[in-house]
Curated annotation (Swiss-Prot):
It comes from the Bacteria. This is NADH-quinone oxidoreductase subunit H 1. The keyword Glycoprotein does not apply. NDH-1 shuttles electrons from NADH, via FMN and iron-sulfur (Fe-S) centers, to quinones in the respiratory chain. The immediate electron acceptor for the enzyme in this species is believed to be ubiquinone. Couples the redox reaction to proton translocation (for every two electrons transferred, four hydrogen ions are translocated across the cytoplasmic membrane), and thus conserves the redox energy in a proton gradient. This subunit may bind ubiquinone. The lineage of its organism: Bacteria, Pseudomonadati, Pseudomonadota, Alphaproteobacteria, Hyphomicrobiales. Keywords: Cell inner membrane, Cell membrane, Membrane, NAD, Quinone, Translocase, Transmembrane, Transmembrane helix, Ubiquinone.
Length: 341
């Protein structure tokens, strides 16, 4: 019995506890990221934004949560009820699953697997199924059209993100997220992070992440002027909330990936005191919020692309450009003798 406790039950309880703690912290982070998104958008438009609920509007997201929970969920008469209700759950759970392998500090990760980047790419690819299920089961033309757009859009830009990962892999020699951060730990500080030598790759990743998460200017899936609310037209109450939660969790995942792949993860920008006194998780959060600020500014200042422009950018610009960058990075590493052994 003692062996069963120490070998199986206790490790299982530890993982469950870590997962619940991560979930709670992630949900609180999402609440304030959503508020920051609205505040940034308001500032660009010279408005005040949410400022009534709580001091400076800090409790606005929790008020919105209560509003959604107490609304009545509606199911269209011709909808496939099972698939209709399962779709938001699939979208949300798959978005949350990606955080199992993301290290927020040295050793602070639930599963430190050697293929962490591929795991995140695979899980984010599966999240499109939730949108397709919602579009098909709603028995409405607008959600169905949005689901078709989403499938094409996510497949198109996952290719570019895949080549971005290959470029970073060539520099590091590992798909382990912790190893990628440690490879950027040099005496040069932020000048040794991959955003500088791989700047074109960083730009490709940033724009592809916008498209992958259906953020403006690539929000063709839920284009208000064309498709009302896209695949979420027929949803209300908690199912709608789950879709929103899945969307913002996916955004935080991409922000965390950008911080790890290009901004040194939890490493300080200057590897000397007093910067080294700051806990690594604080640096990780600051870099994640910087990436989200770039996401929010794109929403505030860039007009929406047409669908044909979106596809053209993905297949005719980013795909060949990312492939060329992979070849250039591989060539430079080989001829300069910098390739990882």
């Amino acid at each position: 019995m003692a062996e069963f406790w120490t070998s199986y039950l206790w490790p299982l309880l530890v993982v469950i506890g870590q997962s619940l703690l991560l979930l709670i912290l992630l949900l609180i982070t999402i609440a304030y990221i959503l508020l920051a998104d609205r505040k940034i958008w308001a500032a660009v438009q010279i408005r005040r934004g949410p400022n009534v609920v709580g001091p400076w509007g800090l409790l606005q997201s929790f008020a919105d949560l209560l509003k959604f929970v107490f609304k009545e969920p509606m199911i269209p008469s011709g909808a496939n009820k099972g698939v209709f209700l399962l779709a938001p759950l699939v979208s949300c759970v798959l978005a949350l699953a990606a955080w199992a392998v993301i290290p927020v500090n040295a050793g602070w990760v639930i599963a430190d697997i050697n293929v962490g980047v591929l795991y995140i790419l695979a899980v984010s690819s599966l999240s499109v199924y939730g949108i397709i299920m919602a579009g098909w089961s709603s028995n409405s033309k607008y959600p169905f059209l949005a689901a078709l757009r989403s499938a094409a859009q996510m497949v198109s830009y996952e290719v570019s993100i895949g080549f971005v990962i290959i470029a970073v892999l060539l520099c590091v020699g590992s798909l382990n997220l912790t190893a990628i951060v440690e490879a950027q730990n040099t005496k040069w500080g932020l000048l040794g992070w991959y955003w500088l030598p791989l700047f074109p790759v960083f730009v490709i990743f940033y724009v592809s992440a916008l498209a992958e998460t259906n953020r403006p200017p690539f929000d063709l899936v839920e284009a208000e002027s064309e498709l009302v609310a896209g695949f979420m037209v027929e949803y209300a109450s908690t199912p709608y909330l789950l879709f929103m939660l899945g969307e913002y969790v996916a955004i935080t995942t991409m922000c965390a990936m950008g911080a790890i792949l290009f901004l040194g993860g939890w490493l300080p920008p200057v590897p000397y005191a007093p910067f080294t006194w700051v806990p690594g998780i604080i640096w990780f959060m600051l870099k994640g919020f910087f990436m989200f600020f770039l996401f929010a500014m794109a929403k505030a200042i860039v007009p929406r692309y047409r669908y044909d422009q979106l596809m053209r950018l993905g297949w005719k610009v980013f795909l060949p450009l990312s492939l060329v960058m992979v070849v250039i990075v591989a060539g430079v590493l080989q001829f300069a003798g910098l390739a990882p052994q």
